[in-house]
């Protein structure tokens, strides 16, 4: 729990120091690493998404999760969602998180 909190705070500090990171990188990272399952529009309506019953990132169910919860899912995986620890940098995880938050 403490490790997740420290990781989340570190990610938020990096994001605060680099405001242009999200604008330039987030959609590209999402498209490259997430869209195959979650869809380019993040609704989960891909063939894989429908089969695995992937949640729509625009939904209140997803948006009510804390940044720490979403960061943990992205890095460690959950259920059928694979872990991206070691596959995404902390900055890329932050970009994906900010992209998800932009879908409100």
Could you describe each region identified by the protein language model?
Residues 43-72:
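Gly/Gly-Pro-rich "capping" loops immediately C-terminal to redox-active cysteine motifs
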């Amino acid at each position: 729990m403490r490790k997740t909190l420290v990781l989340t705070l570190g990610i938020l500090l990096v994001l605060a120091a680099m405001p242009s990171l999200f604008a330039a990188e987030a959609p590209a990272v999402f498209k490259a690493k997430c869209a195959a399952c979650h869809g380019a529009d993040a609704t989960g309506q891909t063939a894989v998404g429908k089969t695995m019953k992937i949640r729509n990132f625009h939904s209140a169910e997803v948006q009510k999760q804390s940044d720490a919860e979403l960061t943990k899912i992205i890095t460690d995986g959950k259920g059928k969602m694979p872990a991206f620890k070691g596959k995404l940098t902390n900055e890329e995880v932050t970009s994906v998180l900010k992209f998800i938050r932009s879908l409100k």
